[in-house]
Amino acid sequence: MQDMIRYSVITEKNPREIVLLRGTGCAWKRCTFCDYHLDCCPDEAQNFALNRAVLERVTGQYGRLEVINSGSFCELDAPTMDEIARVCQQKGIAHLHFECHWMHRGKIAELRARFAAIGVQTHLKIGVETFDRAYREDVLHKGIGVSDPAEIAAQFDECCLLFGLSGQTADSMRQDIQTGLTHFDRVCVNVMVKNTTPVLPDPDVIAVFCQQVAPHYVNDPRVDILMENTDFGVGGAAQ
């Protein structure tokens, strides 16, 4: 993939630095709407070289760092994980956010313990996309084989939702956000954008979201709304 912007600073709603690192690739790769897994490399040495350069930009200005890698934290190489820990200690990072697919939930406890040992609290985010199990599994192929939101949230702290898809309504989107806020600390709403998959954004559903749903949450400090997948400042093409 072309060079991308991999470091940014989020100044509103839970201010933090964010880095887009590169791993060996999402192990799931079955979500019908997602092509993020294309940002990967099988060469761990090359990944570490790239990731170390990105992590060198972290200043610790907010004491909070979000690490994303177009997959799950466990797909990052060991030297990169060591470097993340070193940067947290060196820059005074007290809160560290990672992403994780449901299939890797069994690895979360060890991750939390590792960083807790150096005084860093971890926050794990899962891409749920919707709490409508039939839509999530039959249409989106997320691979989360349970229906109970509380069970999904048991090992996670934050969730991502995906809106702007055919079949979604104002009521379904509001219900997803409310369910997310009930069971998770934070909710990140992503609006579908055109990518390389056959799944297309539905402009009518997006209009409904913008007019009837988003205004109720745009000022909620626990809800991030990304109209574009680059709104956090990473992922766009580097100049």
Language-model segments: residues:
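Distinct, well-ordered alpha-helical segments
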Residues: 76-85, 105-116, 137, 170-174
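Conserved C-terminal portion of the radical SAM core fold
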Residues: 145-202, 208-232
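Core AdoMet radical
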Residues: 36-51, 58-78, 88-107, 121-146, ...
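Generic low-complexity, intrinsically disordered segments
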Residues: 94, 113-117, 153-155
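Short amphipathic alpha-helices and their capping/turn segments at secondary-structure boundaries
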Residues: 52-58, 104-119, 174-183
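Canonical Radical SAM [4Fe-4S] cluster-binding loop centered on the CxxxCxxC motif
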Residues: 4-49
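Short, flexible/disordered intra-domain loops and linkers
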Residues: 44-45, 78, 138-140, 170-171, ...
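N-terminal pre-core extensions flanking Radical SAM catalytic domains
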Residues: 1-3, 8-10, 30-33, 226-239
